[in-house]
């Protein structure tokens, strides 16, 4: 499994909730071919994390520019910085009940 990891840091923590509502209303992960799951986490009042898991590297690479484009608009709207990384899920340390 291949992942895109988005680390988000808000300059104003009060915008995180508003940003998440915007994302829930305007972002449709079902349009991404090969997307297995998308998870979002609150880490601290001003930090969040999103993880997109794809079935293969080709599908991950295909949607990387779409996610970067959405993130750029999101950064401008909600006064935050998004750092994007890619990685591979370790099947030996991946557990899903």
Where would I find each of the regions flagged by the language model?
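Short S/T/G/P-rich N-terminal loop/turn motif that feeds into the first structured element of a domain
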Residues: 1-49, 55-69, 76, 80-97
């Amino acid at each position: 499994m291949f992942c895109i990891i988005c680390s988000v840091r808000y300059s104003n923590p009060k915008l995180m909730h508003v940003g998440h509502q915007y994302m829930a209303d305007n972002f449709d992960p079902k349009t991404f071919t090969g997307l297995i799951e998308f998870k979002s986490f609150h880490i601290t009042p001003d930090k969040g994390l999103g993880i997109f898991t794809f079935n293969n590297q080709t599908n991950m690479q295909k949607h990387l520019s779409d996610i970067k484009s959405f993130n750029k608009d999101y950064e401008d709207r909600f006064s935050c910085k998004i750092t994007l990384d890619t990685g591979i899920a370790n099947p030996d340390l991946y557990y899903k009940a």
